[in-house]
Design a protein with these regions (language model features):
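Alpha-helical scaffold elements lining the catalytic groove of polysaccharide deacetylases
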Residues: 82, 131-158, 175-221, 234-237
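Bacterial N-terminal signal peptides
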Residues: 16-25
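Boundary at the C-terminal end of the N-terminal hydrophobic targeting segment
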Residues: 27-35
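Bacterial N-terminal signal peptides that target proteins for export
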Residues: 2-15
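Active-site beta->alpha N-cap acidic-glycine motif
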Residues: 38-140, 144-157, 164-166, 231, ...
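Short secondary-structure boundary segments
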Residues: 195-196, 228-229, 256-257
Length: 263
C-alpha cells in the first residue's frame, strides 16, 4: 500500500478545497469580485411583524435604511432578452438585488429564475400575470397571488405551500386594497412598495433613464428603488448606474426574510 506523507495529504486537501470553491456559487462570486466593485454593504433581514408594508410612495413607513443606502428591486421578469444582462451587470459589481417575478414568466423561463437564486439574489412575488388586483374580486385576486407564488416555489424548491419560501410581495401597479393588505399581513407576507422609481415603463433612452433615476436618488438620499428587468433601456443603463452609485457614495443593502426560508 502506498504511504501518504504529510505534504501529499495537504496537497489533496488543498485540491478538495479548491474544487469546493469552484462549485460553490457564493464563494465563486466572492473570488471574482474586483477590488473596485460596488459590492453589497450589508444584509437586512426584514421582519413581517415590524415592517409589514414598506415604501413611502405607497405606505407611511419604509425599511430602516441609513442615508445613501439603497435597495435595488426589479419587477416583471424573468425575461430572456433583458434579465441576463441585468444579472451580468449585478454580478460584475458583486451586488445583490430583489426580483419580484411573474409566475407566467417563471414557468416560461425557469432557468433564469434558478440563475437569480443561485447568484444570491432574493426571489420575491408579483402575481401570476400582472393583473391589477383592486379591479377584481377578492377571491380572484387571492388566486392570482397564490398561483404566482406556487409557480416560483415549484420551480425553485419542487413544492409549494400556503406561505411562500420568501414572503415578499409587490402589487402590480401598486393596485392594492385594504382587504388584500390585511390578508397578506395575516399570512406574514411583507408588501413592498417603493421609495422611488426609474419610470422605465415610459419610452426613454438609457442615458435619459440614468439621469432621471440618479436625480431622484440624490433627492431621496436613498431608499427602495424600483426598476423593471424586462426593459431594454434599464438593462443597458444598469452598468453605468451601478458605477455611479459607487462614485456618489451610495451603498447597496440586500434584503432577505427575517424568518429563515423553509423550502
Amino acid at each position: 500500500m502506498t504511504s501518504l506523507t504529510l505534504s501529499s495529504v495537504l496537497r489533496r486537501r488543498s485540491c478538495v478545497f479548491c474544487l469546493w470553491l469552484i462549485l460553490t456559487p457564493g464563494a465563486q462570486g466572492r473570488a471574482e469580485c474586483r477590488a473596485d466593485a460596488l459590492g453589497t454593504s450589508r444584509v437586512l433581514a426584514v421582519d413581517p411583524t415590524a415592517t409589514p408594508r414598506v415604501g413611502r410612495k405607497q405606505f407611511p413607513a419604509t425599511l430602516p435604511l441609513g442615508t445613501r443606502e439603497v435597495v435595488l428591486t426589479f419587477d416583471d421578469g424573468p425575461w430572456p432578452g433583458t434579465t441576463p444582462h441585468v444579472l451580468d451587470a449585478l454580478r460584475s459589481e458583486c451586488v445583490k438585488a430583489t426580483f419580484f417575478v411573474l409566475g407566467s414568466n417563471v414557468v416560461a423561463h425557469p432557468d433564469l429564475l434558478r440563475r437569480e437564486l443561485s447568484e444570491g439574489h432574493t426571489v420575491a412575488h408579483h402575481t401570476w400575470s400582472h393583473r391589477l388586483l383592486n379591479r377584481t374580486s377578492l377571491a380572484a385576486a387571492q388566486a392570482e397571488i397564490d398561483r404566482g407564488i406556487a409557480a416560483v416555489d415549484d420551480v425553485l424548491y419542487g413544492k409549494h405551500e400556503a406561505k411562500p419560501v420568501t414572503p415578499f410581495f409587490r402589487f402590480p401597479g401598486f393596485a392594492s386594497s385594504p382587504a388584500l393588505l390585511d390578508r397578506l399581513a395575516y399570512r406574514r407576507i411583507v408588501v413592498f412598495g417603493a421609495d422611488l422609481w426609474a419610470s422605465d415603463w415610459k419610452p426613454m433612452s438609457p442615458d435619459a433613464e440614468l439621469r432621471l433615476v440618479l436625480k431622484r436618488l440624490e433627492q431621496a438620499r436613498g431608499g427602495i428603488v424600483l426598476f423593471h428587468d424586462t426593459k431594454r433601456q434599464t438593462a443597458a443603463m444598469l452598468p453605468a448606474f451601478l458605477r455611479a452609485l459607487k462614485v456618489r457614495g451610495f451603498r447597496v443593502v440586500h434584503v432577505i426574510p427575517r424568518e429563515p426560508p423553509q423550502p
